[in-house]
Structures are given as structure tokens and as C-alpha cells.
């Protein structure tokens, strides 16, 4: 085949035109040490704190320690396939999770990947897990109630939208049950719920999902699960991921309730991670920044100003104490960060007082601002009467000859305690709570035997639904008890009481 010189030159010119020189510049590093879910990488000089790094075999890690000659990285997957000398690439991204309506009703892991077998999550929206909390100007004071449906809480330790209320107590005192009841009570309201399980057993998470499905609460709930068998970095990320999902709704003007169950296990996961990264240990071997770990998470709960859409993110963190020791490191930290705490006691739980709330040391620093007027009016004396009852009950053990006034106070206290008991998965609407607390504080139940109080309560609320539904509707509509409504309520209580007593005779 003969080619003329001019043909050769035209072919070469054509080839030169088509030639594309693609240069891809990537900041890469080399693994110098790996083990226990931690990798040390040489290179990556421009790496950011918290940046996502890509290892071979699609394993990702998160940069934590930026040192002079290496980067300490925690792995978000198995380290079994990673070897010394492997190339690590920067992604230029901070860890993100999917957000939006598509997540409702789903169970996801700490990276927002579905783990419920219902297929992929169809959303294009992503948010960084670490965000700066809203500033002072962006916020508004907490003033709307978030009804938990639990009489002891809504009456004495009210929670407002945008508040951070700690649930604290020993193991097996009903902390999770309290949180789940609060989620169930948000049905038919405009509140979206997120339950973050940190270091829990898989069976526990499955049981919670089952309970929420039975109550019809899963349709407005997201479960973020990082179970006990998962890597410490994933347990560390889970609450921030859940918070990012909640912030997406909050910034669209919606109301969100998020439960962190529990932050004790979160701190333990962070301690394990920090010690493996060779960070110096402090009190109880926790790293020095364990306060910041929780404060930067809980500060993201807020009630936004009207200019920012008026949305809210209410946080209910849970802390597990050891033998009721509230003065340990993590409990004191979280108590000082939150706007109040609900303290659950083993003694009360074992005595059959459930929910086992101790009103003496439980407090809501938002207080009456988070209550409707009607509840404020009827429940004002409740805490005082209970405190007097506890004091007198202690003295009454030593002597039997008590004066009439003391006997009356003891009798009233017993009835209040009985009224505040409530079965699990049975939250009560606020108007029914108000009617029942009104009947108790106005001493209509003094001549009803303590063992009959629960029957009286269920019968009375049925009677109000059937015979006087307008009383409840009026309380809900106005948020207060008018003189007319109060007169109707008094009449209804007396009428039902006669009927109840007649049935018992």
C-alpha cells in the first residue's frame, strides 16, 4: 500500500485534532497502618476535618485527626480488605445523608441507607451531617406545647416545641417507653418524628418498629438505627444523621420531634473511637471534647423565628445512669446542656408507679410557656400537693394518730398518684387529661376508694365522650376553661360520680 507524503501529513493532523489530553489531578495518600477500624494515611496534605475519604473496594472513611505527617481516619466499613500501601483518595465532600419526605416510614442506617428491605429511597436531596446550629437572631422563644400524652409530664414537666428535654434514669425504668408513647401521641398532629437508636440490640429496634406500626405511627416516623454490632464511627454518626434529616423539615417550616436513644452509648462509642485514634483520655477515660460532642448536637434543636419559617426541632435525648448516679460525667454534661430533665426512678417503677417520674427532681426550664391555659389552671397545685404528700407519707410511717388535715392531704396525695399512673402505648389527649386532673385537684375523688380510681377514670372519660363531647371540644378549640365549660364539667363529674357509686353498692 503506497501512501503519498501529503496523505501521511493530513492523517497525522487529523489524529492531532482528535487527541484529547485529559489530566485528572487527585490528592492521594498511602495507608501506613490499619486495624481496629482506624487507618493512618501518609499524604493528603489538603484534607479537611470530617472529610469523606475513598479506599479501594468502595470502603469509605472519615478524616478525624489531621496531624503533621499523617491523617487519622475512622472507617465506615470493614477494614478486612484494606492493606498497608493502599492508595486513598480525597472526595472533597463532608459526610452527607439523604433527606426529605421519601424517608418517612423507613428504617435507615447512620449513612441514610435503607435497612428495612423496602427498596431504595428515592430522593435527590442530601445534607451534611454536621451543621452549625441556628444563631440567636434565627430563633424564637419556645411557646407552643408539644403534647406527650403522658399526664405526669404534660401537667408538671411540660415540653415545648423547640425544647431539649432529657429523659434520664437507670436501665429498665421505662425511658424508651416514654419516648415511644410521645411519638404515638403525635398522630393526627403536624409533628414528624425521628427515632435514633444508638448501640441498641437489633431485636429492640425491630420491636419498636413493630409497636409504631401497630399504632399507625410509622407513616410520620423515620428510624435511624446504628445497632450494638456496628462500628463505633457509625454509632457516633447516627444522632448527627438523624438531626440532619430533622433539620430539612424544620427549615421548611414543619415541626419535628427527635429522640436520641441513648447518648450514654453514643459517648462510649466516641470514647472507643478517640482512644483508638490515640487522643489523650480525660475524666472516666472520655476525651476532653465529650461535652462539645453533645452540645453541638443538642444546640441544633430550635424553634425558628417567623422570618425563617417558624419550624421547630424538639430533642428528647435519653441518658442511662448507673445505680441512680446523676452526678457522673455524661449525665451532668447533658443535664447542663438541656432545658430540663425527666428523672425516672427504679424504686417508683418497682412500686407500680408507671411512668416512674420523680416530680421532685424533674424539671422543665420552659415551664408554663409550653402549656395551654387550661392545663396551667388545673395542674398548678399538682407538684406542691405531691411534694407535701411525699413528706407527710414519710412521717406517717412512724405514727398512726394523725390529725384530720394530715389525713386529708395523705388521702388526696394517694389519689393524685393513682391518677398519674398510665399504661404503656396509651397516651391521653390533653383535653381528657385536663378533665381528669380537674376532678382530682378539686377533690371530687376523695370519697372514691383508691383501688377504684382507675375504673372511675376510664368510665368518666367514656361518659364525657358520649354525654358531654362539647366540653372536650371547647377546651381544644379555646385552650382554656371558660366559666360555662367549668360549670358543665362540674355537673358532669357529680352526675357520673352518683352513677359510679350506685354501681359499686
Curated annotation (Swiss-Prot):
Keywords: ATP synthesis, ATP-binding, Cell membrane, CF(1), Hydrogen ion transport, Ion transport, Membrane, Nucleotide-binding, Translocase, Transport. ATP binds at residues 169-176. One of its GO terms (molecular function) is ATP binding. InterPro entries: ATP_synth_asu-like_sf, ATP_synth_asu_C, ATP_synth_asu_C_sf, ATP_synth_F1_a_nt-bd_dom, ATP_synth_F1_asu, ATPase_a/bsu_AS, ATPase_F1/V1/A1_a/bsu_N, ATPase_F1/V1/A1_a/bsu_N_sf. It is an enzyme of class 7 (translocase). It comes from the Bacteria. Its main location: membrane. Its EC number is 7.1.2.2. The record marks 362 as: Required for activity. GO terms for cellular component: plasma membrane; proton-transporting ATP synthase complex. It is a peripheral membrane protein. It is found in: Cell membrane. It catalyses: ATP + H2O + 4 H(+)(in) = ADP + phosphate + 5 H(+)(out). PANTHER family: ATP SYNTHASE SUBUNIT ALPHA, MITOCHONDRIAL. Produces ATP from ADP in the presence of a proton gradient across the membrane. The alpha chain is a regulatory subunit. F-type ATPases have 2 components, CF(1) - the catalytic core - and CF(0) - the membrane proton channel. CF(1) has five subunits: alpha(3), beta(3), gamma(1), delta(1), epsilon(1). CF(0) has three main subunits: a(1), b(2) and c(9-12). The alpha and beta chains form an alternating ring which encloses part of the gamma chain. CF(1) is attached to CF(0) by a central stalk formed by the gamma and epsilon chains, while a peripheral stalk is formed by the delta and b chains. Belongs to the ATPase alpha/beta chains family. This is ATP synthase subunit alpha. It comes from Alkaliphilus oremlandii (strain OhILAs) (Clostridium oremlandii (strain OhILAs)). The gene is atpA.
Amino acid at each position: 500500500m503506497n501512501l503519498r507524503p501529503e496523505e501521511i501529513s493530513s492523517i497525522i493532523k487529523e489524529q492531532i485534532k482528535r487527541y484529547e489530553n485529559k489530566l485528572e489531578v487527585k490528592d492521594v495518600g498511602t495507608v501506613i497502618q490499619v486495624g481496629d477500624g482506624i487507618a493512618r494515611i501518609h499524604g493528603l496534605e489538603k484534607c479537611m476535618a470530617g472529610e469523606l475519604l475513598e479506599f479501594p473496594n468502595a470502603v469509605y472513611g472519615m478524616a478525624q485527626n489531621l496531624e503533621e505527617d499523617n491523617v487519622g481516619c475512622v472507617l465506615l466499613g470493614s477494614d478486612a480488605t484494606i492493606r498497608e500501601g493502599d492508595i486513598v483518595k480525597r472526595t472533597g465532600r463532608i459526610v452527607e445523608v439523604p433527606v426529605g419526605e421519601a424517608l418517612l416510614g423507613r428504617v435507615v442506617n447512620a449513612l441514610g441507607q435503607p435497612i428495612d428491605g423496602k427498596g431504595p429511597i428515592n430522593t435527590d436531596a442530601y445534607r451534611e451531617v454536621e451543621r452549625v446550629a441556628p444563631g440567636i437572631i434565627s430563633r424564637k422563644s419556645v411557646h407552643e406545647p408539644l403534647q406527650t400524652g403522658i399526664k405526669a409530664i404534660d401537667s408538671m414537666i411540660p415540653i415545648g416545641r423547640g425544647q431539649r428535654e432529657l429523659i434520664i434514669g437507670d436501665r429498665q425504668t421505662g425511658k424508651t417507653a416514654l419516648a415511644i408513647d410521645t411519638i404515638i401521641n403525635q398522630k393526627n398532629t403536624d409533628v414528624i418524628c425521628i427515632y435514633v437508636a444508638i448501640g441498641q440490640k437489633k431485636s429492640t429496634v425491630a420491636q419498636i418498629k413493630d409497636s409504631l406500626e401497630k399504632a399507625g405511627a410509622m407513616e410520620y416516623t423515620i428510624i435511624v438505627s446504628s445497632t450494638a454490632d456496628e462500628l463505633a464511627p457509625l454509632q457516633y454518626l447516627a444522632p448527627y444523621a438523624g438531626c440532619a434529616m430533622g433539620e430539612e423539615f424544620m427549615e421548611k417550616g414543619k415541626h419535628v420531634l427527635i429522640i436520641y436513644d441513648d447518648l450514654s452509648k453514643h459517648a462510649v462509642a466516641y470514647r472507643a473511637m478517640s482512644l483508638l485514634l490515640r487522643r489523650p483520655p480525660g475524666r472516666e477515660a472520655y476525651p476532653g471534647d465529650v461535652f462539645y460532642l453533645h452540645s453541638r448536637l443538642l444546640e441544633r434543636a430550635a424553634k425558628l423565628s417567623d422570618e425563617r419559617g417558624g419550624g421547630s426541632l424538639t430533642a428528647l435525648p435519653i441518658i442511662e445512669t448507673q445505680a441512680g448516679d446523676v452526678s457522673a460525667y455524661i449525665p451532668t454534661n447533658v443535664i447542663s446542656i438541656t432545658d430540663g430533665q425527666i428523672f425516672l426512678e427504679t424504686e417508683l417503677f418497682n412500686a407500680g408507679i408507671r411512668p416512674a417520674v420523680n416530680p421532685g427532681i424533674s424539671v422543665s426550664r420552659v415551664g408554663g410557656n409550653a402549656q395551654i391555659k387550661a392545663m396551667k389552671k388545673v395542674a398548678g397545685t399538682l407538684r406542691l400537693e405531691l411534694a407535701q404528700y411525699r413528706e407527710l407519707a414519710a412521717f406517717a410511717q412512724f405514727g398512726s394518730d394523725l390529725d384530720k388535715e394530715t389525713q386529708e392531704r395523705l388521702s388526696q396525695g394517694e389519689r393524685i398518684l393513682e391518677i398519674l399512673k398510665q399504661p404503656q402505648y396509651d397516651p391521653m389527649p390533653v383535653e381528657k387529661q385536663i378533665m381528669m386532673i380537674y376532678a382530682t385537684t378539686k377533690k371530687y375523688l376523695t370519697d372514691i376508694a383508691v383501688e377504684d380510681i382507675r375504673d372511675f377514670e376510664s368510665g368518666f372519660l367514656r361518659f364525657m365522650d358520649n354525654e358531654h363531647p362539647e366540653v372536650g371540644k371547647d377546651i381544644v378549640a379555646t385552650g382554656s376553661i371558660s366559666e360555662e365549660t367549668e360549670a358543665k364539667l362540674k355537673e358532669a363529674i357529680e352526675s357520673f360520680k352518683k352513677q359510679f357509686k350506685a354501681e359499686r353498692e
